[in-house]
Amino acid sequence: MFESIQGLLDEHADLQIRLSDPAVHADQSLARKLGRRYAELSTIVEGYHQVQQLSDDLAAAKEMASEDSEFAAEVPVLEEQLAHAQEKLRRLLIPRDPDDGRDVILEVKAGEGGDESALFAADLVRMYSRYAESKGWKIEVISATESDLGGYKDIQIAVKGRSNDPAEGVFAALKFEGGVHRVQRVPVTESQGRIHTSAAGVLVFPEVDEPEEVEISQNDLKIDVYRSSGPGGQSVNTTDSAVRITHFPTGIVVAMQNEKSQLQNREAGMRVLRARILAHQQELIDAENSAVRKSQIRTMDRSERIRTYNFPENRIADHRTGYKSYNLDAVMNGDLGPVIQSAIEMDEQSRLDALSGSSE
């Protein structure tokens, strides 16, 4: 697996030269793209040098072991360190999701359960917002439709966080949140104290850095305008400011009504549409690659139930990874790291298994 690393070392050296050229930074989109790739390769180069150094140290220790007991004692320690470094490098060489370094547009939609589901959708948004704050990311509400009790029938938020390392990107962490989230608790509307089960759906899309990344022909769009509505369906605007955009080639439909003007809603709608089309394009690429399709959690059915939040037991369980913990209160306050990490590790292992299988 390490045989192909020389090409990556050469690419890293070439990128270092290119990024020192002021002309490259005149094109911010190009500079950002090259910077992400350089950061990704820097981690691999560092891991490779660590393996080389430990290999040299181990060889020297073995050579001196027969003459010096201290060197002999170092041999098993260095062997363990080398094995760990090789495994780390092997994982670093697994091809990354090309969208890992991107920001995210995250949608939460109330599902079965009526008002309780809408309240749970609001709880999920709060959970993601607090997790984002802990990572130093920024949250922006793009569109939201509130329920009568203050929850969300649906909401779209942008999550932004600058990182040159794709492994630390917003999409790298949040892409595994897509799916159906089930909650078990006593609703605020329940007078008998009975536990109810409801659900909310989460969709996660990588956001494009520049509008030009996704080509959209105006001939492929149908744009309808209508009056925006608030909780209970009542009209909150006397003008046709809400916008519904249909993209014929993909069948994707985006509705936007939060902004005050039709133009602002159209711009917000196009922003979301570009993110959805980008995700759609990547899904088509994944579908052509059987190894990726089989290994990535990201490509699972969005209607799949991925997680259960059991409030009476203070328990959270991820049904894909087997993760279970009894600190639901902390998770709902943004302590989402261990849950997300379980999905990242499962995805890495699946990719590694697929890669190992293809090389046999």
From Swiss-Prot:
The organism of origin for this protein: Renibacterium salmoninarum (strain ATCC 33209 / DSM 20767 / JCM 11484 / NBRC 15589 / NCIMB 2235)
Post-translational modifications: Methylated by PrmC. Methylation increases the termination efficiency of RF1.
Gene Ontology molecular function: translation release factor activity, codon specific
Keyword Cytoplasm carried by entry: yes
Location of this chain's protein in the cell: Cytoplasm
Protein name according to UniProt: Peptide chain release factor 1
Record-stated family: Belongs to the prokaryotic/mitochondrial release factor family.
PTM-bearing positions, type N5-methylglutamine: Q234
